[in-house]
Amino acid sequence: MNNKGCIKCGSTEAGQKEIATTGTGLSKLFDVQHNRFLVVYCKNCGYSEFYNKESSTAGNILDLFFGG
């Protein structure tokens, strides 16, 4: 079984973006965006996965997305 490609549509074209979000409590009240994520998304269907920037390794995030 070939596990390469998007798990929703099978496409092998992906992109990535960084986002920042607020937490709960005071950080939400004061709009402090200290939670940073790397978003990997399928360019065909839009399926997305979020990876925590602080805990994920810098390399091969796209490999994780495609099951490699």
Swiss-Prot record:
Any matching Pfam family: Zn_ribbon_13
Q: Which InterPro entries match?
A: DUF2082_NA-bd_Znr
Q: What is this protein called?
A: Uncharacterized protein YpzJ
Native species = Bacillus subtilis (strain 168)
